[in-house]
Design a protein with these regions (language model features):
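HIT superfamily nucleotide-processing domains
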Residues: 1-157
Length: 157
């Protein structure tokens, strides 16, 4: 299925331009036209699926993740200073299932197995989603609060 009002469907069908970097029969990866780092890419399903990854059929989601993995390896090889590529499945921007890939420039040493921690020093705690995802650690949470939150979440498992 394709939706005429979906820009990713238009791109997948070849009706809108993109700068492709990898593709197979079910997926297409292309450079973002709004990059916040060199090589920032988007991997989409060729068929239209809603953007919330965890509402997708397991086979569809697994296919997208494997396509993202293949694309990430291409990005890792394409940049001398990249040893890892980050993945986000936030589902905003376009209501079409997609993964965002971020080559992590400055991580080349990690590719050879020389793991090292990289800490941003960020300390902002988010009460609500602000349009972007941050992966830095914040202040240490109390074990009492964490235990209560874990108990609450387990009730829905």
């Amino acid at each position: 299925m394709h939706r005429a009002d979906c820009i990713f469907c238009q791109i997948a069908q070849g009706h809108s331009p993109c700068h492709p970097i990898w593709e197979d029969e079910r997926h297409l990866a292309f450079l973002s036209i709004f990059p916040n780092t060199k090589g920032f890419s988007v991997v989409i399903t060729r068929e239209h699926h809603g953007s919330y990854a965890f509402a997708a059929d397991e086979t569809v989601l697994a296919g997208l993740v494997l396509a993202a993995q293949k694309t990430a390896k291409v990005l890792d090889r394409a940049f001398d200073d990249v040893g890892r590529t980050g993945l986000i499945l936030e589902g905003f921007g376009v209501d079409h299932l997609h993964a965002k890939l971020f080559p992590m420039h400055g991580t080349a040493g990690l590719a050879s197995g020389q793991w090292q921690p990289i800490n941003s020093g960020g300390r902002k705690y988010f009460e609500k989603y602000e349009g972007y995802i941050s992966s830095y650690d914040c202040e240490r949470a109390s074990d009492v609060e964490l235990a209560a939150l874990a108990a609450h979440i387990r009730r829905f498992a």
